[in-house]
Amino acid sequence: MTENVLLVAANTPFNNSLLTYLGEAQKGDLVEVPLGKRVIPGIVLDENASIEGLDQDKVKAIKGPLTEQIKIKDKDLDLYQWMANYYHYPLGQLVWDSLPKILKRPRELKFTQGEGKEFSFTLNEEQRPVFEDIKNKLFSGFSKHLLHGVTGSGKSFVYLSLFKEVLNSGKSVLFLLPEINLTKQFVNLFSQYLNVPIYLYHSDISNSDKYCLWGKVQKLSEPVLIIGVRSSLFLPINNLGLIIVDEEHDASFKQDDRCTYNARDVAVKKASLQRIPIVLGSATPSLETLNSFQSGQGHYHTLNKRMGNSTLPKLELIDERGEDKDEELWPLTNKTVDEIQQALTRNEQVIVFINRLGFSNYLMCRNCGHKFTCPNCTLSLRYYKKKDVLKCQVCELKTPRPSECPDCGNMKLLNRGFGTERIQDILQKK
């Protein structure tokens, strides 16, 4: 039997990872191929490649299939090829990076079965037109929507209503979230009202579940809801009908290592290639997204009111220039501390957000101005009062707090900047 000439994208960091082999395989198959003295994985791009200009006797044969559980379909392969070109990343390596660990004996796949209760809510006068507008475009090919709704406006209930429409039509839904810790609240909500299996896909899911889910979703005949982070974008879902990206502005959708892609943008491309609608949701859309939709590159929907009788909190910006300086309270102001005390008197809770750890940003000699820096990173060492140490935020080097300046011997060392420990000290004294 004559072997086919295969074009394979191998898992290598080479700019041109497309290599020619002989063997029996089909487009989209995952195979093992020899490269030098190594055997590496790859994906078949063409099962009838041209061998013109090559000596067929010198063309090596593939070692065999890597797995029969996973096969990359044409639409998914088109997405990989677009990403490889757009982000300038080797195609074979891109595919391999997105795959789950290949297992020989995967366990049974875990999932949450929805209860399918009747909706206990009705969309309000602001949500209903948004839902109807998107609903009218659900089954008309590719469309792009931005749902710009203030916090508490009920975007989740619009999503849920859209899910039900798509799932009832026999198609599946992919719901993308930026962080793992957001999945539980959505599973609890969606599982009440949707009578379909709900699968999770993120880094806390076992390798066995990931591998099984890849094999399952490409053969789906029944609709499912998949909730996941950016890596779930590559799942080869057979009958996908809708993609929703919640909190589209979140930086966690950007991958900073290996292929540095933005999952939001890749999700839009995936929807375009599969000719299905996509909804981006946010209370604070990114500037590029907002500009794109406001300039007519998609359907722009707004929710400006909170659900029920709840109102938006009152925001007040305190100008420190008009406040009397109190060194004991710095960086807090008298007004801030007074507001905190009043809230506690009313038995209310208070959250103080501080985006710095430790007691101070750095130590400085009062006499000569010497700053204590990390010998490895040359960055300022942050002071932690509770442990009485200086610590580097990059390499995590730790050193006891010095008693004097190494340059001039002065023993008066000043704390500069502030962190959570200093704020805690101030509030405990008050």
Features from the language model and the residues they span:
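Hydrophobic alpha-helical scaffolding
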Residues: 70, 279-283, 326-329, 398, ...
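Structural signal for conserved beta-strand scaffold positions within catalytic alpha/beta enzyme cores
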Residues: 46, 200-202, 280, 302, ...
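Accessory, non-ATPase domains that flank or precede helicase/AAA+ motor cores in DNA-metabolism machines
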Residues: 1-282, 289, 294-310
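Accessory interdomain/linker segments of ATP-dependent helicases and helicase-like nucleic-acid enzymes
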Residues: 1-17, 343-346, 358, 366-371
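Glycine-rich phosphate-binding "P-loop"
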Residues: 118-119, 142-152, 252-253, 315-330, ...
